[in-house]
């Protein structure tokens, strides 16, 4: 599961390629403590294991006690779930980093379990595996950025004025163009906002602030604050490139990112071997500090007005064409590694509905090997995140098999890769599905179900946006739990896990968690502060309640069964923002 973050990714070019990666690798200690205190530590975006390294004295060896607890007998349903986690979160899997040999072994394991559960292959060429070409990229050097105002060129200083962006589409990027300031780079008719109003950016470089104004709703603010979405808007306007500007008062200051300027980022590769980006042909060229922005804008009155407006908390900024040109010369280093999604399907039984597909997802990868903890443990096993979700997916498939009744619609079980790198496996499948795209009618996503307490309710992020909400409420009632409210709506969790890649294709989607009622919030917070994205997220965790895992599986099965057997396909609520934006069924 990805660590908590907002999509106002500051000035990081990484956020353009993958909105999750900034927090994954560059989370400051100050930020970490603040977010953990407010329990925003949700991984729909991954943190580097290094940020959680411990300096405590080595504890006593508890291996014998751990083995006794792990190997204690359980009822069959609990033991079946636990067995999957025992394998997937074992040290032999070395944290299941996407693209690693251990991830590939984990994928083969899931494929074998799909076969045992009676699922038909739904990957490539009659197999359970869908090949996913992962492309890592980073700036090959510091590049050069030169601002010219009034005929006088000024070369910006690396590390003080700018850090370069990588371009997964090209190895070499050369641009020399005028610059237009476009506020936050947002076009939002429902907020009566168009930051491109009155300016022509065709063939120009667009300079924008990161994030979105606080006047936007939580989930929609996360969407509009995404640098990937901003770049896509810039591309639609004909911009030649994007420059991200350090926002005054940013929680992600430029200085914190300089040490990480050349870390590897990741996307998926197209058939030509080039990296996929939402904004094709409009690369994010660089991120500018406040000092760099001052050199770019000089004494432009519009810039002075914009910085004052941001400092004063005013949401609307006036866009303007600057009197400057910017020449950028950048090089990108790339490397390819193959990974795979794992897809199995139960064919539908209703002649009129069997071609429609309900996709159930969970991510298989975790963060791999990292800095040692106090015990010297370097393997970040990812038991809860997300071996537990994969185990739930497999056991849910067995529920369908054991029911003796095929679903009316087809049901696909999809274990995706590289969630921790930016929802990449899910995005690849959503763009390149192994079933007809227009036949995918719903997605239900499982990511890091924390089963350390007896949950009294379930949270279905995104439920209110489509008829899936009514289905979830009816289904969970049959297993004795209610539907809780979003515990942190301002954080926009709806856009922060694999299901969002289906939303972006217009598919009604929900993301399920055990709820926070009763002792849930306290238990969830404890997991985040002691085990989340640490080497201690292991099956030896004495707080894991396997009977609650079975309850979670049963609730998910009932939800999926009702979606698959309903007379009507799921539909977006009429006028819903995401449904309308992505042309989803029922929204217009």
Residues covered by each model-derived region:
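His/Asp/Glu-rich mid-to-C-terminal helical/loop segments that flank catalytic regions of hydrolases
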Residues: 398, 402, 513, 519-582
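Noncatalytic luminal/extracellular "stalk/propeptide" segments of secretory-pathway proteins
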Residues: 94-213, 322, 334, 338-339
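Soluble metallo-hydrolase cores and metallopeptidase-like ectodomains found primarily
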Residues: 69, 148-150, 158-198, 275-382, ...
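N-terminal hydrophobic or amphipathic helices/low-complexity stretches enriched
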Residues: 54-123, 355, 573, 588
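Metal-dependent peptidase/peptidase-like ectodomains
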Residues: 156, 269-304, 416-516, 520-528
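Extracellular/luminal Protease-associated
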Residues: 157-276, 347, 378-381, 385, ...
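Acidic/histidine-rich catalytic neighborhood of metal-dependent amide-processing enzymes
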Residues: 223-229, 250, 368, 374-467
């Amino acid at each position: 599961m990805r660590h908590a973050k907002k999509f106002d990714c500051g000035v990081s070019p990484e956020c353009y390629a993958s909105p999750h990666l900034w927090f994954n690798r560059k989370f400051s200690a100050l930020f970490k403590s603040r977010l953990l205190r407010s329990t925003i530590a949700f991984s729909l975006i991954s943190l580097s294991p290094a940020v959680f390294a411990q300096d405590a004295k080595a504890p006593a060896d508890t291996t014998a006690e751990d083995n006794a607890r792990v190997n204690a007998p359980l009822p069959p349903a609990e033991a079946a779930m636990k067995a999957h986690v025992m394998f997937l979160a074992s040290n032999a899997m070395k944290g299941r980093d996407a693209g690693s040999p251990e991830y590939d072994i984990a994928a083969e394991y899931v494929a074998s379990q799909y076969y045992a559960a009676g699922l038909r292959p739904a990957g490539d060429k009659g197999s359970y595996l869908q090949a996913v070409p992962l492309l890592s990229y980073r700036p090959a050097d510091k590049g050069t950025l030169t601002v010219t105002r009034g005929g006088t060129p000024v070369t910006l200083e690396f590390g003080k004025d700018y850090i370069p962006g990588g371009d997964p589409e090209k190895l070499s990027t050369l641009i020399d163009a005028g610059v237009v300031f476009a506020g936050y780079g947002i076009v939002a008719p429902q907020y009566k906002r168009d930051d491109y109003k009155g300016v022509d950016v065709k063939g120009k470089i667009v300079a924008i602030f990161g994030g979105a104004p606080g006047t936007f709703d939580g989930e929609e603010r996360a969407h509009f604050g995404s640098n990937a979405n901003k770049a896509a808007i810039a591309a639609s306007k004909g911009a030649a490139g994007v420059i991200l500007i350090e926002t005054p008062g940013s929680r992600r200051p430029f200085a914190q990112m300089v040490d990480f300027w050349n870390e590897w980022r990741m996307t998926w590769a197209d058939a030509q071997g080039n990296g996929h980006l939402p904004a094709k042909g409009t690369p994010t060229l660089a991120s500018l500090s406040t000092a760099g922005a001052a050199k770019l804008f000089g004494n432009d009155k519009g810039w002075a007005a914009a910085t004052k407006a941001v400092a004063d908390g005013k949401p609307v900024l006036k866009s303007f064409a600057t009197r400057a040109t910017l020449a950028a010369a950048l090089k990108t280093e790339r490397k390819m590694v193959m990974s795979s999604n794992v897809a199995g399907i139960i064919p539908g039984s209703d002649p009129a509905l069997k071609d429609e597909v309900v996709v159930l997802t969970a991510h298989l990868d975790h963060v791999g090997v990292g800095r040692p903890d106090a015990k010297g443990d370097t393997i970040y096993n990812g038991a809860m995140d997300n071996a537990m979700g994969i185990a739930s997916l497999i056991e849910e498939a067995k529920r369908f098999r054991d029911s003796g009744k095929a679903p009316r619609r087809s049901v696909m079980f999809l274990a995706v890769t590289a969630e921790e790198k930016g929802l990449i496996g899910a995005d690849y499948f959503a763009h390149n599905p192994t079933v007809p795209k227009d036949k995918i009618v719903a997605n239900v996503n499982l990511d890091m179900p924390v089963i350390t307490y007896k949950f009294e309710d379930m949270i279905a992020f995104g439920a209110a946006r489509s008829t899936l909400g009514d289905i979830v409420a009816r289904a969970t009632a049959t297993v004795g739990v209610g539907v809780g409210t979003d515990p942190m709506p301002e954080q926009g969790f709806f856009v922060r896990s694999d299901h969002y890649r289906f939303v972006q294709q217009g598919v009604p989607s929900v993301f399920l968690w055990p709820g926070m009622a009763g002792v849930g919030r306290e238990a969830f917070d404890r997991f985040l502060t002691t085990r989340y994205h640490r080497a201690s997220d292991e099956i030896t965790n004495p707080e894991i309640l396997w009977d609650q895992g079975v309850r979670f599986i049963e609730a998910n099965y009932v939800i999926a069964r009702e979606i698959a057997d309903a007379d009507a396909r799921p539909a977006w609520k009429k006028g819903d923002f995401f449904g309308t934006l992505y042309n989803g069924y029922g929204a217009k």
